Regions:
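Nucleotidyltransferase catalytic core that binds NTPs
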Residues: 1-122
């Protein structure tokens, strides 16, 4: 089974998110969405999220956009979810440059057998 992982805030689920998640899901057998915790949204976007992380997680699951959705680590760049799910592939959004670099550095440092791929914009 090929597990695919994606990361995001998903604060106000919209058609761009839906496209991204469907595209990621098509790349494997099992899609796990890692929803940024509220504190991370505050740090990344310099504002409070519109909806708490549990509501954002539930929205993804209620639309059947993923096989599982989890709340990300409170500690930035801990990547505990990688050990938990052992993805073969991580899909990166068109606007996730900082995430792509941080993940690439971690994967290289830890010598993990994970491929990163950037998905197109809608």
């Amino acid at each position: 089974m090929k597990t695919v992982l994606v990361f995001g805030t998903f604060d106000g689920l919209h058609n761009g998110h839906r496209f991204f998640l469907r595209e990621a899901r098509s790349r494997g057998d099992y899609l796990v969405v890692v929803v940024a915790p509220d504190r991370a949204v505050q740090e990344l976007k310099s504002r409070e999220p519109r909806a708490p992380h549990e509501v954002r997680r539930a929205a993804i699951l209620s639309e059947n956009l993923a096989d599982d959705a989890v709340i990300g680590d409170e500690e930035q760049d801990a990547w505990k979810v990688l050990n938990r799910y052992k993805p073969a592939l991580i899909c990166i959004g068109h606007d996730q440059d900082a995430l792509a670099k941080a993940l690439a550095d971690f994967i290289k440092k830890e010598r993990l057998p994970i491929t990163l791929t950037r998905l197109p914009k809608i």
